[in-house]
């Protein structure tokens, strides 16, 4: 059997209902919409979230919090992750993204955290380092550079 020989099972495919095409079809005249009213009209219906005039849920619940426009957003990377790179490699946000170590670079760059151990001497360029991360990078013989 080949792909072009595949056919649906007998009786599995039914013709599409053609509405408003004569009374003999059973779906003529009003086409299953009933007589009159909002739902029978073209474009009839209510907007999303409308609850018949009662106060909608979105307005019954209180507003919470705010978005701080000055918030810093970093992609966090632990030093133990950097062990996958060769000795002497210069680690940048772009390198981490291209090697799929991180999925995206935060709006303010990357921040190196001190979780785990680092055995390789690497030059790490990042927007921020924690004190423990910087200590571990320098202890391994590498450099922590702010960009």
Swiss-Prot record:
Gene3D superfamilies: 3.100.10.10
Single GO BP term: translation
Annotated SUPFAM superfamilies: Ribosomal proteins L15p and L18e (SSF52080)
Function: Binds to the 23S rRNA.
Family classification: Belongs to the universal ribosomal protein uL15 family.
CC per GO annotation: cytosolic large ribosomal subunit
NCBIfam families: rplO_bact
Protein name, per record: Large ribosomal subunit protein uL15
Biased composition (Gly residues): 23-35
Keywords of this entry: Ribonucleoprotein, Ribosomal protein, RNA-binding, rRNA-binding
Signal sequence, start to end: none
């Amino acid at each position: 059997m080949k792909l072009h020989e595949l056919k649906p099972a007998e009786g599995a495919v039914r013709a599409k209902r053609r509405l408003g095409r004569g009374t003999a079809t059973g779906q003529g005249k009003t086409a299953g919409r009933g007589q009159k009213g909002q739902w029978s009209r073209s474009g009839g219906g209510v907007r999303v979230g409308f609850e018949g005039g009662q106060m909608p849920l979105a307005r019954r619940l209180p507003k919470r919090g705010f978005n701080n426009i000055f918030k810093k957003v970093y992609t966090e990377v632990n030093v133990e992750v950097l062990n996958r790179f060769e000795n002497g490699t210069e680690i940048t946000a772009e390198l981490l993204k291209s090697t799929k170590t991180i999925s995206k670079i935060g709006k303010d760059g990357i921040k190196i955290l001190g979780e785990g151990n680092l055995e390789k001497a690497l030059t790490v360029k990042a927007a921020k380092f924690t004190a423990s991360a910087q200590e571990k990078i320098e202890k391994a013989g590498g450099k922590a550079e702010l960009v």
